[in-house]
Design a protein with these regions (language model features):
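Vicinal oxygen chelate
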Residues: 31-128, 163-168, 184-210, 213-275, ...
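A short beta-turn/loop motif at secondary-structure boundaries
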Residues: 10, 32, 71-75, 155-159, ...
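An N-terminus-focused feature that recognizes amino-terminal "leader" regions
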Residues: 1-80
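A structural feature that tracks compact, well-ordered secondary-structure segments
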Residues: 4-7, 28-32, 39-43, 93-94, ...
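Core segments of cupin and vicinal oxygen chelate
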Residues: 1-25, 125-174
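A compositional/structural signature marking long, glycine- and acidic/polar-rich segments
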Residues: 157-224
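N-terminal beta-strand motif that seeds the catalytic metal site of vicinal oxygen chelate
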Residues: 37-42, 98-132, 144-146, 187-194, ...
């Protein structure tokens, strides 16, 4: 449905490694006791930046674990550490990602995913510790605020207003991490996003999802903050996958944090599956 490429050399009966580009993998799916999101990885440019980041975590008293050579080999990187954000989300930080010698070929003839210099897409977490998590990503991880959305997500005027912090790292993608003031879902993640090169590929993916009886969590729509044309579908792990096209890439030297009061210009009517 999504059109990723299985890395045959790395995958086995317990692990599925999925490619989006020249990287050996961008997603790893493994057998576990629960169907849910596990952890996300963030890349720094080089060993010097990696050592600076680990020193900053140490100086701030934030616990982290050096994962060693064995896991680094599995992750196809030079070195990595792991730690948690204040919401309990497990994160990894690494440098020196390997390049796969084999050409990327989409399983669904997708011309390409928009990843180069941008990462796999974005992740949006739900937590009741949203302020602490926001401070962590902006002050410790040194992300920047792209957009802050404050709105009521139900028609009930008595329901409290929620907030979503959309944050960017050191690349042009509008946001790499979102933090929503909401209970952490059982899946551990609200949604992940992948981006393709044409609107037609978004519509084709929605058709494939429907044909394969994948629950469509949201209709097609155009987001206000990053201008992404997309739809959302439910994954077997329980979180949503946003499949999009045409997200903006701001110039961070001139960008000023925006304040949204609605998620979309049009569309994106959500229909969540029954628990």
């Amino acid at each position: 449905v999504v059109g990723l490429m299985k890395n045959e050399d790395m995958s086995d009966e317990n692990n599925l490694f999925l490619r989006m580009d020249e990287s050996p993998f961008r997603f790893q799916v493994f057998k576990g006791s629960e169907n849910k999101y596990s952890k996300g990885g963030f890349e720094v440019a080089n060993k010097e930046d990696f050592e600076d980041a680990t020193k900053q975590l140490f100086d701030l008293g934030i616990a982290f674990h050096d994962e060693g050579e064995d896991l680094a080999k599995v992750r196809c990187v030079k070195e990595l550490i792991s730690f948690n954000d204040p919401a309990g989300n497990s994160l990894e930080l690494f440098y020196g990602r390997d390049i796969d010698k084999n050409e990327f070929k989409s399983s669904q003839d997708i011309s390409g995913f928009v990843t180069h210099g941008l990462g796999l897409g974005h992740l949006v977490f739900g937590t009741l510790e949203a302020e602490a998590a926001h401070d962590f990503y902006t002050q410790v991880m040194e992300f920047g605020d792209s957009d802050i959305m404050r709105m009521r997500f139900t028609p009930d005027p008595n329901d409290p207003e929620s907030v979503i912090y959309f944050m960017h790292c050191d690349n042009p993608r509008h946001h790499t991490v979102g933090i929503m003031l909401a209970p952490t879902p059982p899946s551990g993640l609200i949604h992940a996003m992948v981006e393709v090169e044409t609107a037609e590929q978004v519509v084709d993916a929605m058709d494939r999802a429907t044909s394969n009886n994948i629950h469509i969590s949201s209709t097609l729509g155009r987001h206000m903050n990053d201008k992404m044309f997309s739809f959302y579908m439910q994954t077997p792990a329980g979180f949503m996958l946003e499949f999009g096209y045409d997200g903006i890439q701001p110039d961070w030297d001139v960008h000023e944090t925006t304040n949204s009061e609605a998620p979309s210009y049009w569309g994106h009517e959500f229909n969540m599956p029954e628990a």
